[in-house]
Design a protein with these regions (language model features):
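C-type cytochrome heme c attachment motif
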Residues: 32-41, 64, 81-87, 99, ...
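Primarily extracytoplasmic ectodomains and periplasmic/lumenal surface modules that are beta-strand-rich
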Residues: 37, 73, 125-126, 182
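Structured core of small recognition/catalytic domains
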Residues: 186-236, 253, 322-359, 368
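Flexible internal linker/loop segments at domain or repeat junctions
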Residues: 212-214, 281-289, 297, 310-312, ...
Length: 392
C-alpha cells in the first residue's frame, strides 16, 4: 500500500469514528427512552440479564437476558433478528414472545432507532452469563403457538407515521409515547385477551387509565396537569402538589429523568393534546368519621399536615391530589397498606412512605382513606373494606 493510499485510508477511518460513536451514544439514549433496564434487570449487579417476574392470569413470565452473552443473551442475534423480535415479537429461535414484552409499541419505532439500540446492546453492554428463567405457566397453557393467533387479532407491526397536520414537537411526542416509551402498556385499559384496547391517540381509550399489579396507572389524557407540572413530574417525580410512588417511580428513576428537555416537552405536548371528557362528581361521596380523624392526626398529620397541604416539593399534598381522588382507589390503598418510595433523581433522593398494613384492619383503613377523600375540599367516592382486602 502506498503512503498516499494509507493516508487516505487513515483519514476515512478517522472521519468514520465519530459517526459510529454518535450512533452508540444515541443507542444508549434509546435504551433509556425504552427503560430497558427496569424490566430486564432483576439483580443490579447483572444489568440486562433478565429474571424480572411479570404476573399474568395463567402464571408468571420472566424477562430475558438481553446482554450480548452468546449462550444466554442475544449475542448471536443479527440486526435482522433483533428487529424481528422488537417489531414482530418473534425470537431468533423462532418462538413467539409473550406480549409482556411490549413489541406492540416497539413496532412503531424507526429502523434507524432500532439499529442504534442494537449497536448499543452489542457493543457497549457487558455480557452476562446468566441463564434465562423458564415461565411458571403450566402445559398446555405454556404452548406458544396461540400467541401467533393473538398477534393476528391484536398486533399492528406498522411503523409510526407522522401527522402532517401537527407540529414537529407533537409528532416527536407521539412517536416517543406510542413507541419506545410504551406508555400505553400501563396506562391503557386491556380487553379480555389482555390486549391493549388502543395503541394510539385516535382511540379515546388510549392512555385512559388501567389497573396493573395492584396499582392504578391513571388517565393521563388532556390537561389535568400544566405543561410545567407534568414535565417536573417526569423529570423529578415531584411537583408542588404531588409525588410519584409505585412502578412509575421506577420509570422516573431509571428512565424519564434522563430524557432530553425537548423530548420531555414533546411528550407532554402530545399527551395534553389528547381529548378527554370532564370528570363528573361521584354519585356517592366518601364520609369522614371521628375515629378516622383521630387516626389521621396520629399517623398522617405530622407529614401531610392537618390541612392536607403537605410540604412543598417534599411531602405531597393530599388536598386535590389526583391519586387521592382517582375513581379507582387501588394505588391509594396500596400506598397506605404497603408504603412506597419516591423516585431517586439528580434533584432529589427518594424517601419512603411507611406501610400501615400492620396497624389498620380493612375497615379502619377504608375509614381513614374515606376521611382523606372527604376532607379539605376533596370529593372522592367511598373506599370499601373490600377494596382494602383485595390489596392485602
Amino acid at each position: 500500500m502506498s503512503r498516499s493510499t494509507l493516508a487516505i485510508t487513515s483519514l476515512i477511518l478517522a472521519l468514520s469514528v465519530p459517526a459510529v460513536n454518535a450512533q452508540v451514544s444515541e443507542g444508549e439514549y434509546i435504551a433509556t427512552l425504552g427503560d430497558c433496564v427496569a424490566c430486564h434487570t432483576s439483580n443490579s449487579e447483572q444489568p440486562l440479564a433478565g429474571g424480572m417476574a411479570f404476573p399474568t392470569p395463567v402464571g408468571d413470565v420472566y424477562s430475558t437476558n438481553i446482554s450480548p452473552d452468546k449462550t444466554h443473551g442475544i449475542g448471536n442475534y443479527t440486526l435482522e433478528d433483533f428487529i424481528k423480535a422488537m417489531r414482530d415479537g418473534v425470537a431468533k429461535e423462532g418462538h413467539n414472545l409473550y406480549p409482556a414484552m411490549p413489541y406492540t409499541s416497539y413496532a412503531k419505532m424507526r429502523d434507524e432507532d432500532l439499529e442504534a439500540l442494537y449497536r448499543y446492546l452489542m457493543d457497549e453492554v457487558e455480557p452476562q452469563a446468566v441463564a434465562n428463567r423458564p415461565t411458571d405457566i403450566i402445559w398446555p397453557l405454556s404452548m406458544r403457538w396461540p400467541l401467533a393467533v393473538w398477534k393476528w387479532f391484536y398486533h399492528d407491526d406498522s411503523q409510526f407515521e407522522p401527522d402532517s397536520k401537527q407540529s414537529d414537537e407533537w409528532n416527536r411526542g407521539a412517536y416517543l409515547v406510542q413507541g419506545a416509551g410504551h406508555c400505553g402498556t400501563c396506562h391503557t385499559p386491556r380487553g379480555f385477551a389482555m390486549q391493549e384496547l388502543a395503541l394510539d391517540g385516535t382511540n379515546d381509550k388510549y392512555l385512559k387509565g388501567a389497573e396493573l399489579d395492584g396499582w392504578y396507572a391513571g388517565d393521563i389524557r388532556g390537561d389535568l396537569y400544566s405543561q410545567e407540572e407534568m414535565v417536573a413530574l417526569l423529570k423529578t417525580g415531584r411537583s408542588d402538589k404531588e409525588a410519584v410512588l409505585g412502578p412509575m417511580a421506577d420509570v422516573i428513576t431509571h428512565s424519564s429523568q434522563h430524557f432530553r428537555e425537548d423530548d420531555l416537552n414533546s411528550i407532554v405536548t402530545y399527551v395534553r393534546s389528547l381529548s378527554t371528557t370532564p370528570v363528573s362528581a361521584p354519585t356517592q361521596l366518601a364520609q369522614a368519621s371521628e375515629s378516622a380523624k383521630t387516626d389521621y392526626k396520629m399517623y398522617c398529620g405530622t407529614c401531610h399536615g392537618s390541612d392536607g397541604v403537605g410540604r412543598d416539593h417534599i411531602i405531597p399534598a393530599l388536598a386535590g391530589n389526583s391519586t387521592v381522588l382517582a375513581d379507582n382507589p387501588a394505588s391509594l390503598v396500596n400506598i397506605l397498606l404497603h408504603g412506597g418510595q419516591t423516585a431517586t433523581t439528580k434533584a432529589h433522593i427518594g424517601y419512603n412512605m411507611p406501610a400501615y398494613d400492620w396497624k389498620f384492619n380493612d375497615q379502619q383503613a377504608a375509614d381513614l382513606l374515606n376521611y382523606i377523600r372527604a376532607s379539605w375540599g376533596n370529593q372522592g367516592a367511598p373506599v370499601s373494606a373490600q377494596n382494602v382486602k383485595a390489596q392485602r
